[in-house]
A protein has these predicted regions:
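Membrane-proximal interfacial segments on either side of biological membranes
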Residues: 1-68, 74-77, 91, 96-169
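Repeated loop/turn-to-beta-strand initiation elements of outer-membrane beta-barrel proteins
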Residues: 79-81
Length: 169
C-alpha cells in the first residue's frame, strides 16, 4: 500500500493519466470521486472502490471520446461499469458492462448511435482486438446508422441488433 489513502478522493477539473498500464488512459477535465481511495503501486485507484467520474475528454487504449460519464466499481481485478456514456466517432455510446478478472467481458447493454469511424486498418486487423480477450458475452447490442471505413472495406448505414451472443476462444 501507498503511504496515503482517504475515505474519498474527490477530483474537480483534473487531468488523469495512467500510461504504461493494462489500460492506457489519458483524461482531461475530470470531475468525480473514488471511494474509498486506497492507491497501490501500479494501481492509482486501488483494487476495491466505487467510482463515479465525468471527463471532458478521454482516450483509452488509443480510442478518443468526449463528454464521458462512468459509474461503477472496482472489485479486485474485476471492473463493473454500471453506467457508461460518451460521445465518440461523431456519435454516441451508452451501456453497461463487466470485465471479469480473467479479462473476459460481459456487455449487458450497449448502444452505438451514428458512429462515423475511419480506420487505417484492414478489416481483419480492425477486429483483431476481439482475439485478445478470453471471451465476449453480449446481452444486447444496438447499432443505429453506423458508418465504418478502412482501406478496401466500408460499411454504411449499418443498423444492427444483437441479443445473447457469446464469442469465446
Amino acid at each position: 500500500p501507498m503511504p496515503f489513502q482517504a475515505d474519498r478522493l474527490q477530483l474537480n477539473n483534473m487531468a488523469f493519466n495512467s500510461p504504461n498500464t493494462e489500460w492506457d488512459l489519458s483524461a482531461q477535465k475530470v470531475t468525480g470521486g473514488v471511494s474509498p481511495w486506497q492507491p497501490e503501486a501500479g494501481n492509482v485507484l486501488g483494487k476495491n472502490a466505487q467510482i463515479q467520474m465525468s471527463a471532458g475528454s478521454l482516450t483509452l487504449n488509443g480510442v478518443p471520446a468526449t463528454n464521458v460519464l462512468i459509474q461503477g466499481q472496482l472489485n479486485g481485478k474485476e471492473v463493473v461499469l454500471n453506467t457508461i456514456g460518451a460521445d465518440m466517432a461523431r456519435g454516441s455510446l451508452t451501456g453497461s458492462a463487466l470485465r471479469n478478472a480473467d479479462g473476459s467481458w460481459v456487455i449487458d447493454t450497449m448502444r452505438l448511435n451514428e458512429i462515423r469511424l475511419q480506420s487505417d486498418k484492414s478489416l481483419l486487423d480492425f477486429f483483431a482486438p476481439l482475439n485478445t480477450i478470453p471471451s465476449l458475452q453480449i446481452g444486447r447490442l444496438e447499432v443505429t446508422d453506423a458508418r465504418l471505413q478502412g482501406p478496401d472495406w466500408a460499411v454504411t448505414e449499418l443498423d444492427l441488433s444483437l441479443r445473447d451472443l457469446t464469442l469465446s476462444k
